[in-house]
Amino acid sequence: MNNSLIVRQLGLQDYQEIWHKMQDFTDTRNAETQDEIWLVQHYPVFTQGQAGKPEHLLQRSEIPVVQSDRGGQITYHAPGQQVMYVLIDIKRHKNLNVRQLVTALEQTVVKTLAEYGIESYPKPDAPGVYVDGKKICSLGLRIRRGCSFHGLALNINMDLNPFHYINPCGYAGLEMCQLADFVNQDEADCDNVSAKLIKHFADLLGYNITTL
């Protein structure tokens, strides 16, 4: 197995632009293409997953709504949320299937939050990561030709109010939280968090990291 993992720090980006780049990357990759992680924050946007239902958008606003091809329901992205897109050739990993990749992503977040003294957990019936019943991380993937794209969105230090305009991930009344609710403001930093996410994800799947 090629165990190299390229990590790209992309900063603040338009959702649709990055989404289409992920599609192009996945459509054109071959057996020699190295797996990649894209770390990004997005301008404010609601994204509907393939299972998304219009009724879960409770209130219209100036925030655009984009119909995406990832799994899951509606969610919200904005600056102060660390998004980690995983462009992985699952076929390369002998003991990895889609469910196990989801578990690895959830455990990546659990281990990262544990470094801040936060006890978090996944739910078997609702992908993502939770703290005291509130959701801190959303997760949605798309698999094409055995390769993943999309990934996770971890709330760090953002305006959570637009989550009230939706039923997050299709769950009415689901409360959201973020790292800044539990730590000092200077600790709630996307760059610091992303470094921890990458380390734990690479450790879980046995990658060597190259940062670009």
Swiss-Prot record:
Pfam families: LplA-B_cat
Catalytic activity: octanoyl-[ACP] + L-lysyl-[protein] = N(6)-octanoyl-L-lysyl-[protein] + holo-[ACP] + H(+)
Chief place where the protein resides: cytoplasm
Acyltransferase among keywords: yes
Subcellular localization: Cytoplasm
Pathway(s) annotated for this protein in UniProt: Protein modification; protein lipoylation via endogenous pathway; protein N(6)-(lipoyl)lysine from octanoyl-[acyl-carrier-protein]: step 1/2
Keywords: Acyltransferase, Cytoplasm, Transferase
GO MF terms held by the record: lipoyl(octanoyl) transferase activity
GO cellular component, one term: cytoplasm
Listed PROSITE patterns: BPL_LPL_CATALYTIC, LIPB
EC annotation from Swiss-Prot or TrEMBL: 2.3.1.181
Entry annotated with the keyword Kinase: no
Entry binding sites for substrate: 70-77, 138-140, 151-153
Residue stretches making up the BPL/LPL catalytic domain: 31-209
Function description: Catalyzes the transfer of endogenously produced octanoic acid from octanoyl-acyl-carrier-protein onto the lipoyl domains of lipoate-dependent enzymes. Lipoyl-ACP can also act as a substrate although octanoyl-ACP is likely to be the physiological substrate.
Misc. remarks from the entry: In the reaction, the free carboxyl group of octanoic acid is attached via an amide linkage to the epsilon-amino group of a specific lysine residue of lipoyl domains of lipoate-dependent enzymes.
Family the entry assigns: Belongs to the LipB family.
Name this polypeptide is given: Octanoyltransferase
Biological source species: Haemophilus influenzae (strain PittEE)
Gene: lipB
